[in-house]
Amino acid sequence: MWNLRITPLSFGAACQGIFTSTLLLSCVTVPLVCTIVYDSCLYMDINASRALANVYDLPDDFFPKIDDLVRDAKDALEPYWRSDSIKKHVLIATHFVDLIEDFWQTTQGMHEIAEALRAVIPPTTTPVPQGYLIQHDEAEEIPLGDLFKHQEERIVSFQPDYPITARIHAHLKAYAKINEESLDRARRLLWWHYNCLLWGEANVTNYISRLRTWLSTPERYRGRDAPTIEAITRPIQVAQGGRKTTSGTRKPRGLEPRRRKVKTTVVYGRRRSKSRERRAPTPQRAGSPLPRSSSSHHRSPSPRK
């Protein structure tokens, strides 16, 4: 990696800002293109490719700060560095760790020099509006040697007799802004690659999908807490660690004899006596009255007799 030093001179700081901004654009674009081509053309799953593209849509406050991000990435990459691993995620994450760490220090130095120049800028000087400063998308299409000239022409069009110290201050602010936007893209890619090493590419893909679903759901219809990658991977670890293995072969379920269910009938109401059910019906002619039972003709003897 290049050892970049911030010069104390204002003109040197402006020139170095142009160099670092353009160099950062190329260093971020090359691994980004290599990652997309490598993943899409070879073996990367289509769901993982979509999740990698959806990382750019996540809010800025979702990702940790650059200092914390670099420290966490180094802790995750340390075992792979010891074993000299050449995995895809290891190589790309290592590249972004060095890139982000060096250029973040350079960008902070540019901000410090820009703040120091405020003391020598005349108080009546009007700051350059944001519309006159080169943006990140425009800087990608401008060649390296023409970046300073394009920015200078915009400052002159705003105010021809603009003070030299204020011009250098505007240059530094524009280049630092370009660096920050490039670093934002780089830190999102770094977060993706080193988390794939920690949790697995499939788990990170599932986590991004659930998180985007939670964010797109209205607040009144979603849960209070956002999904976490630890909660997604915890059931898998518990199921693998707590499963008990039984000895012997288990009999297939299809070969077991089926047990016939015994139907039970419930009779509601008064139960008829068996004597009535067994009594044969008496013959009867058509039109004749119903026969009376023999007990109705003869009265039972009185207990007194």
Swiss-Prot record:
UniProt-annotated stretches for the region Disordered: 226-305
Q: Which InterPro entries match?
A: Hepatitis_core, Viral_capsid_core_dom_sf_HBV
- What does the UniProt entry say about where the protein is found? Secreted
Protein name, UniProt field = External core antigen
UniProt similarity note: Belongs to the avihepadnavirus precore antigen family.
Q: Give me the stretches of Basic residues compositional bias.
A: 258-277, 295-305
Organism from which the protein derives: Duck hepatitis B virus (strain Germany/DHBV-3)
Keywords of this entry: Host-virus interaction, Secreted, Signal, Viral immunoevasion
